Swiss-Prot record:
Cell wall formation. One of its GO terms (molecular function) is D-alanine-D-alanine ligase activity. This is D-alanine--D-alanine ligase. ATP binds at residues 180-235. SUPFAM superfamilies: Glutathione synthetase ATP-binding domain-like (SSF56059), PreATP-grasp domain (SSF52440). Mg(2+) 1 binds at D314, E326. Keywords: ATP-binding, Cell shape, Cell wall biogenesis/degradation, Cytoplasm, Ligase, Magnesium, Manganese, Metal-binding, Nucleotide-binding, Peptidoglycan synthesis. Its cofactor is Mg(2+); Mn(2+). The keyword Manganese applies.
Length: 369
């Protein structure tokens, strides 16, 4: 394939959420692994303030170095915009608007954005308006997958096994006595629309609840409180093929008990991205029957939220079987992320995995489907 036949892919990363840095790291890994013989890459960073900039796409600038997290700034490149006009065919134009110089045109967008203002249906809506195909879930599935309350409601409506939980809306300051008795201790307090374990607290005494809610509300006024589930942490990748069929990956396991010398440790932000202390088993050491059940549930969860493209589905393996925790419609793609690892263990290498995602996005197109 010559250069003129390559698919032009805009890799969009950074963004306004508190997962900005992890989005950058994921993008760096993707930029290293997109096959240059098949794809021409346009690297677009979004600053924490929301400005879009055309960058040089250097993966080294998007890595964690000495515990320092990467960030997109206005100095990272040339400021640009994507007009919400399907007649412009994926054109990226310079700013200010009066200049209107076309800096690049793209065939498909890979929105490597984690958290609100990206993974939650917002950029997906923009891309639909602009008429540009994109990798991953559509507007509805992205929004539903981002909000843990509605994810659980959709899972429950399909008869999928979930844990007990309660929701604190902005007008509610704490849990009722009835909710406390129902959930028991310990509980996990989380921003309802967040990821990467940012703002998550483990509460072992109700005296700790108010501080945990305040920590979660630093990131989201809506908070979810989940009953702790005793079990192993399993994950499974789901991938949609260009013909619309859906496949599930090898199952992986995250082992975090006792990390950093604490009995109450969990897979928090530092454990995931900074300390390198969690142990990741791919494939998970589980019976074939359990692995098959997890893969089946992962595909059912994918379909329950009307997902497209890809997802990572997280589980707890309890004494009575797997319980769904959540779905990630744009999982991490860092060098230590489980999603590409699970697919590699399934026989799909990183470049082939990315190529399938892009091909599926192009086959799906935009609009009602």
């Amino acid at each position: 394939m010559n250069a003129s036949q390559r698919v032009r892919v805009a890799v969009v990363f950074g963004g306004r959420s508190n997962e900005h840095a992890i989005s950058c790291v994921s993008a760096g890994s993707i930029l290293r692994n997109l096959d240059p013989r098949r794809f021409e890459v346009v690297a677009i960073g979004i600053t924490p303030q929301g400005s879009w900039v055309l960058t040089d796409g250097d993966p080294a600038a998007l890595a964690i170095s000495d515990r320092q997290l990467p960030e997109v700034t206005s100095a990272s490149g040339t400021e640009l915009a994507l007009p919400a006009d399907p007649g412009r065919s994926g054109q990226l134009v310079s700013l200010p608007p009066g200049a209107s110089e076309v800096l690049a045109s793209v065939d498909v967008v890979f929105p490597v954005l984690h958290g609100p203002y990206g993974e939650d249906g917002t950029i997906q809506g923009l891309l639909e308006l602009a008429g540009v195909p994109y990798v991953g879930a559509g507007v509805f599935a992205s929004a539903a997958g981002m909000d843990k309350e509605f994810t659980k409601k959709l899972f429950a409506a399909e008869g999928l096994p979930i844990g007990d939980y309660a929701v604190l809306r902005p007008s509610q300051s704490t849990l009722s006595l009835q909710d406390r008795e129902r959930l028991g201790l310990p509980v996990f307090v989380k921003p309802a629309r967040g990821g990467s374990s940012i703002g998550v607290s483990r509460v072992s005494s109700w005296d700790e609840l108010d501080a945990a809610v305040a920590a979660a509300r630093d990131h989201d006024p809506k908070v979810i409180v989940e009953a702790a589930i005793a079990g192993r942490e399993l994950e499974c990748g789901v991938l949609e093929m260009p013909d619309g069929t859906v496949q599930a990956s090898t199952v992986g396991e995250i082992r975090v008990a006792g990390v950093r010398g604490r009995e109450d440790s969990f897979y928090d932000f530092a454990t995931k991205y900074l300390d390198d202390t969690a142990e990741l088993d791919v494939p998970a050491k589980v019976d074939d029957e359990i692995a098959d059940a997890v893969r089946e549930l992962a595909i059912r969860a994918f379909k329950a939220v009307d997902c497209q493209g890809l997802a990572r589905v997280d589980f707890f393996l309890t004494e009575t079987g797997p319980v769904l925790n959540e779905i990630n419609t744009m999982p991490g793609f860092t060098t230590i992320s489980m999603y590409p690892r699970m697919w590699a263990a399934s026989g799909v290498d990183y470049p082939s995995l990315l190529a399938t995602m892009v091909e599926t996005a192009l086959a799906r197109g935009v609009g009602l489907r």
